[in-house]
Each structure stands twice: as structure tokens, then as C-alpha cells.
Regions:
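Conserved glycine-rich cofactor-binding loop
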Residues: 19, 26-27
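Conserved glycine-rich Rossmann-like NAD(P)H-binding loop of the short-chain dehydrogenase/reductase
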Residues: 40-56
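The beta1-alpha1 cofactor-binding region of Rossmann-like NAD(H)/NADP(H)-dependent oxidoreductases
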Residues: 51-52, 72-84, 115
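Residue(s) in the substrate-gating loop at a strand-loop-helix junction
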Residues: 153
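C-terminal helical subdomain
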Residues: 186-189, 193-194, 201, 209-247
Length: 247
């Protein structure tokens, strides 16, 4: 009985012993997710391109007693991704939770956008998910378990004027996530998607300014934590997150 208790995570830290990698974890939604998973007991790796923001986020995590590995990386580049995964595993251990959060917004009519705009947005919002997931999945297969949580958007469900490029990236992410879930469930790996509406920290600057009518980064982090703490016999395939008050 004592041995069972030793191997059972503390109820306040159900993710104890887990290692989470959060892309774009140096700011905004990603940082909130990293903090929440760390509070629940996970060791956390964060990455981003802004070294200053990365240092600040890492300091916040360390101040809370969270084991952390931070690394500057461009997740649209396969070489950076390979180094990120290898160094995370060397520092913290095998990755058991991957949160594909890195993303960007670019808005306006399709006919006013350039090929470079398209490439930049799709690389950041979609290619990065493919590259990081591909690098992490073999380790999860070896562990026979894992959670991949992709941060999408309600823009992956709804069209709106000026959203052509952004919506395309998020609709594609929905399809990729669904196929990954079917590919990997036989290995004990769960793939989930979180689709928030407007978030107060959102990069686009679109939407209402009234904070009571938008989500907070913490709201998204709470949904991610709920998915990561789900019992082993089930998974939440898709979560739609909306503010209570309509804009």
C-alpha cells in the first residue's frame, strides 16, 4: 500500500514526473500554459525566438520552483527543432506533453497579401506543428504514452472578412490534428486541439477592447491543464473556448 502511495502523484501536482515542451512559451498564452503545467508538477521546456522574453519567462518559472529548460529556437526550421528536442530531453528527460502553441496572426483581404505573407504565416502556424510533433512522437511511441495539444482557434471553424490566411492556417491545423489523433491513438498518444476565441494577449489586435468580453491567457492554460490531467482511458479531442459575455 505504501509503495502505491509513493508512485501516485500528489493530488495537487497530478503532472509530477511529466516533462512538457511548450513552443512559444516565452510570452502570452504559451507562458501562461507553461506556468500552469509547472504548478501542476511538470518540468517545463519553453522556446521562442525572442531571447529577452525567454529569459524573463524562465526566471518566472524558476521563481516558482519549477524545473525549466529554456532555449532560443525557430520552430519553422527542422534543424532548430531537432536541437530543441534533443536538449530538452537531455536537460529534463523524455517529453510526455507537447503543447504546439507558437503562432502568429496576419490579417487583411487575400488579394492584398503577398506570397511571403502566406509562407510566413503557414510556416509559423502549421509547418511548426508538423516539425515539432514529428520530432517528439518517436519518444512518445517508445514510452507508449503522450499528450500532444495543439493551440488552434475558433478561426479554424469560422470564416470572417480579412481572415483568409489566418483561417486557412487554422482550418488546416484542425485537419492535421484530427489525422494525427487517428494515427497515434494506437500507441497510447492522445492528440487534442484547443480552439479559443479572442484572447486578451492576442497578437492581432482585432476584436473588442473590453477585457470582460475576451478570454485571458489563463483561461487557455486552464483548458490545456484539463486535457493534460485527463484520465488514461479517454481524451478530449477538441475544446472550444469562448468568453461568457458576448462582444
Amino acid at each position: 500500500m505504501d509503495r502505491i502511495q509513493e508512485n501516485t502523484p500528489h493530488p495537487d501536482q497530478p503532472l509530477s514526473g511529466k516533462v512538457a515542451l511548450v513552443t512559444g512559451g516565452n510570452r502570452g498564452i504559451g507562458k501562461a500554459i507553461a506556468l500552469r503545467l509547472g504548478e501542476l508538477g511538470a518540468a517545463v521546456a519553453i522556446c521562442g525566438r525572442d531571447s529577452s522574453a525567454l529569459r524573463k519567462a524562465s526566471a518566472e518559472l524558476l521563481a516558482l520552483g519549477i524545473r525549466v529548460h529554456s532555449q532560443q529556437a525557430d520552430v519553422t526550421r527542422a534543424g532548430d527543432v531537432a536541437g530543441l528536442v534533443a536538449q530538452t530531453e537531455a536537460a529534463l528527460g523524455p517529453i510526455s506533453i507537447l503543447v504546439n502553441n507558437a503562432g502568429m496572426g496576419l490579417f487583411g483581404p487575400v488579394h492584398e497579401k503577398s506570397e511571403a505573407d502566406w509562407d510566413t504565416l503557414l510556416d509559423t502556424n502549421l509547418k511548426s506543428v508538423f516539425l515539432v510533433s514529428r520530432a517528439v512522437i518517436p519518444g512518445m511511441i517508445e514510452q507508449k504514452s503522450g499528450d500532444i495539444i495543439n493551440i488552434s482557434s475558433l478561426a479554424g471553424k469560422n470564416a470572417f472578412a480579412g481572415g483568409g490566411l489566418y483561417c486557412a492556417s487554422k482550418w488546416a491545423l484542425q485537419g492535421l490534428s484530427g489525422c494525427m489523433a487517428e494515427d497515434l491513438r494506437g500507441f497510447g498518444i492522445r492528440v487534442s486541439t484547443v480552439c479559443p476565441g479572442s484572447v486578451a494577449t492576442e497578437f492581432s489586435g482585432r476584436g473588442p477592447k473590453d477585457p470582460s468580453k475576451v478570454l485571458s491567457a489563463g483561461d487557455v492554460a486552464h483548458a490545456v491543464a484539463m486535457i493534460a490531467c485527463q484520465g488514461p482511458q479517454s481524451f478530449l479531442s477538441e475544446v472550444h473556448l469562448r468568453p461568457v459575455r458576448k462582444a
